[in-house]
Amino acid sequence: KCRLVIDFDFKYKEKLVNRQYDEDVIQKFITHIFSKISELYILSDEKKVCFVMEKGSFVDAPQKGYESKDGLHFLFPHIIAEKDTYKVLRKALLDLDIEKICKDAGFTPPSNDIEGIIDEAIYKGGNWFVYGGGKPTEQDKYKLTRIYKETNSGLMPLPIKLWIDNPLEIMKLNSVSNHSELSVDYTDKLQNGLKKKTLKQSISTESIDSMELNPHVLNKAMKYDIDI
């Protein structure tokens, strides 16, 4: 069991001059992800939070046949579930029409297909870099740039300064290390999509995060969410 992290890898056959997405595109991605999450997991409103991590810019692609690459990391810090369920979620996300979203916004869509864009390796024991880390060949690292909370009226941006000022807390949230308990329940649809039907009891996000995170940072962040 670990926190939900979704990795989008964009590869382009063209040599990019500008980044080929903006905040509106990111929000469309997140809205789609949350729609799939709601089909598979039962979670309270306060757990519907997404941290977005980006590099400062796109980079040259080392892969043959591509000129540029970019990416987005989506962290859902209050969703802790079994890794097998994330494979089901990833499969559900494959209907995301990234090409249309990008074209409608006036951007060049990635050249790799959706199977290649939504990385599955992290759910199969693949490597996942700690916050602020990255490949030794790349100087630019993924950093927290946005936080969104899903509400009945859509996505609401939350301030990131509290977390930026406490990078160690982001590192803890960004960990995909094993946890002993779940923080969500599974819908019938998800249970039917799993080969393994044995489910664990969920516990609240508050008790999980309180054990791991700095209480001062956690309490301030949760208070802000409630006030909003």
Regions found by a protein language model. Name each.
Residues K1-L72, F76-P109, W128, G134, ...:
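Signature for HUH/AEP ssDNA processing cores
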Residues S44-K48, E115-A121:
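Extended, compositionally biased
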Residues S68, A121-K124:
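A short, structural micro-pattern
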Residues G116, Y123-I228:
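Long, low-complexity, charged/polar intrinsically disordered accessory regions
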